[in-house]
UniProtKB/Swiss-Prot annotation:
Pfam families, alphabetized: ELK (PF03789), Homeobox_KN (PF05920)
Compartment(s) of residence: Nucleus
Keyword Acetylation applies: no
Gene Ontology CC annotations of this record: nucleus
Gene3D superfamilies: Homeodomain-like
Record-annotated ELK domain positions: 1-21
Classification via InterPro entries: ELK_dom, HD, Homeobox_CS, Homeodomain-like_sf, KN_HD, TALE_homeobox
Function: Probably binds to the DNA sequence 5'-TGAC-3'.
Gene designation: KNOX5
Superkingdom per UniProt: Eukaryota
DNA-binding region(s) from the entry: 22-85
Protein name as it appears in the record: Homeobox protein knotted-1-like 5
Amino acid sequence: ELKEMLLKKYSGCLSRLRSEFLKKRKKGKLPKDARSALMDWWNTHYRWPYPTEEDKVRLAAMTGLDPKQINNWFINQRKRHWKPS
């Protein structure tokens, strides 16, 4: 009885929390066309691969990614593949 009452009262919260946890666990590659657009920018600006805020907004609109995803991609790309010259 108590269990049913609690489930009825908090089922909305529980399902929102469950979906939030599932989102956070989801990892994977970015879409191929988005990666391609980011790599094009990277290859063009390899000597100084720090996009401006305007570049990031344009890339986000072009790729359909969040600005945070764009930012993280560049951070990771520089860390893994860039040797300042």
